[in-house]
UniProtKB/Swiss-Prot annotation:
Main location as per UniProt: plastid
Protein name in the entry: RuBisCO large subunit-binding protein subunit beta, chloroplastic
Domain of life: Eukaryota
Pfam families (alphabetical): Cpn60_TCP1 (PF00118)
Species per Swiss-Prot/TrEMBL record: Secale cereale
Note: This protein shows ATPase activity.
SUPFAM superfamilies to which the protein is assigned, alphabetical: GroEL apical domain-like, GroEL equatorial domain-like, GroEL-intermediate domain like
Length: 499
């Protein structure tokens, strides 16, 4: 069984028996999924808001209102409220990152502090990844330097046979953007390595058996400290990775296109690393800091590519490259006692991490459903800008729906939602709200009850979009289930047994 407290995971599993009802459920599920894709959190709020807009909208349409004008009113109001939301937003301070993460993880400050610490170590734009840990405790470690998932080609290269790792300090790197087929091509480089007494790491597209055998024999004889790995990535991405490694280590990639061949290569094309550590699955290269200027230029170049990239996957990969170059990826290992707890905990940490990234991007607002309630108070001013009375009814629907999340939070905390709403609105300070964890009315910013602006914005936009589709739909087309054929009766027993 999967025990979760994550809106989108629950919504994905909801399948209703009635096919018409199921289409409605799928629509609302879309609001949660879209918010999850963009902001990574706020899925439950999207569902509650969408339900509020639909429930209020159906009432007025049933009474004879024009659904097209109503949804126009909803759309225009949502757009205007997004602009109001941006005015209410403030930039997130480093001290508030832990609060954002903790609120998203269900008031778990252990997770909140760990994410804040990870961000402080690798920077706000740094890469933080999640892993399933092997113990019951959560752990955080930072991978210094550039790490990628490629291990040594042959176990004969290991220097520590207990740990099965290869470690070299002040190591030279030979970068080759093609397959090494012939050991003779390497003679120049290897002879210079023996003379200079320095270890060498070869990174190539692949190394054929004959060339590899030569390297292994030299390593086992002890005449050469050497190791070889396949270049990370495939196709175009492999070429980019090799260029990144070259910039980090100050080396040159050997490519036929630029007129550099392996047999002519000497120690001038080699890069230098302060340390390299290789295991069966991964390689870590720590630069010696001498190429800082080139690295900074390369990072700026990749940032321009991120702005031009359209797909999220592409952006993610480019961000990873920046983190590897700029030195450091933080890894959070999520620990738990059981498999079920681990899955649930990992989802929470993921939500918290996404919420923190969203807060860094677009800033923060007061949490606990109070920001949506404050936006409801701004609807009256927006009504005056709308064209006709039916659009104003659409705006009124938004105003009512914006109270739903806070009322539900209050109800879940065991208090009357309407009373809480009145009490919060009676105070003009927009930071003032209801803290469901303690049952107090207080300054929520100071209490650390904070939501990322991006999450609240996505909730509002996607709930309005789903409600518009729902309210303007007239008919539903579904498949008719085939009636199941009645099972055949058992044929009469005519074996004659028992007569």
């Amino acid at each position: 069984p999967q025990i979760v407290n994550d809106g989108v995971t629950v919504a994905r599993e909801v399948e209703l028996e009635d096919p018409v009802e199921n289409i409605g459920a799928k629509l609302v599920r879309q609001a949660a999924a879209k918010t999850n894709d963009l902001a990574g959190d706020g899925t439950t709020t999207s569902v509650v808001l969408a339900q509020g807009l639909i429930a209020e909208g159906v009432k007025v349409i049933a009474a004879g209102a024009n659904p097209v004008q109503i949804t126009r009113g909803i759309e225009k109001t949502a757009k205007a409220l997004v602009l109001e939301l941006k005015k209410m937003s403030k930039e997130v301070e480093d001290s508030e990152l832990a609060d954002v993460a903790a609120v998203s993880a269900g008031n778990n400050y252990e997770i909140g502090n760990m994410i804040a610490e990870a961000m402080s170590k690798v920077g706000r734009k740094g890469v933080v990844t999640l892993e399933e840990g092997r113990s019951s405790e959560n752990n955080l470690y930072v991978v210094e330097g550039m790490q990628f998932e490629r291990g040594y080609i042959s176990p004969y290269f290991v220097t520590d046979s207990e740990k099965m790792t290869t470690e070299y300090e002040n190591c030279k790197l030979l970068l080759v953007d093609k397959k090494i087929t012939n050991a003779r091509d390497l003679i120049n480089v290897l002879e210079e390595a023996i003379r200079g007494q320095y270890p060498i790491l070869i990174i190539a597209e692949d190394i054929e058996q004959e060339a590899l055998a030569t390297l292994v024999v030299n390593k086992l004889r002890g005449s050469l400290k050497i190791c070889a790995i396949k270049a990370p990535g495939f196709g175009e991405r492999k070429t980019q990775y090799l260029d990144d490694i070259a910039i980090l280590t100050g080396g040159t990639v050997i490519r036929d296109e630029v007129g550099l061949t392996l047999d002519k290569a000497d120690n001038t094309v080699l890069g230098t690393a302060a340390k390299v550590v290789l295991t069966k699955e991964s390689t870590t290269i720590v630069g010696d800091g001498s190429t800082q200027e080139e690295v900074t230029k390369r990072v700026a170049q990749i940032k321009n590519l991120i702005e031009a990239a359209e797909q999220d996957y592409e952006k993610e990969k480019l961000n990873e490259r920046i983190a590897k170059l700029a030195g450091g990826v933080a890894v959070i290992q999520v620990g738990a006692q059981t498999e079920t707890e681990l899955k649930e905990k990992k989802l929470r940490v993921e939500d918290a991490l996404n919420a923190t990234k969203a807060a860094v991007e677009e800033g923060i607002v007061v949490g606990g459903g109070c920001t949506l309630l404050r936006l409801a108070a701004k609807v009256d001013a927006i009504k005056d800008t709308l064209e006709n009375d039916e659009q104003k009814v659409g705006a009124e629907i938004v105003r009512r729906a914006l109270c739903y999340p806070l009322k539900l939070i209050a109800k879940n905390a065991g208090v009357n939602g309407s009373v809480v709403t009145e009490k919060v609105l009676s105070n003009d300070n927009f930071k003032f709200g209801y803290n469901a964890a303690t049952g107090q009315y207080e300054d929520l910013m100071a209490a650390g009850i904070i939501d990322p602006t991006k999450v609240v914005r996505c909730c509002l936009e996607h709930a309005a979009s789903v409600a518009k589709t729902f309210l303007t739909s007239d008919v539903v087309v579904v498949e008719i289930k085939e009636p199941e054929a009645a099972p055949l009766a058992n044929p009469m027993d005519n074996s004659g047994f028992g007569y």
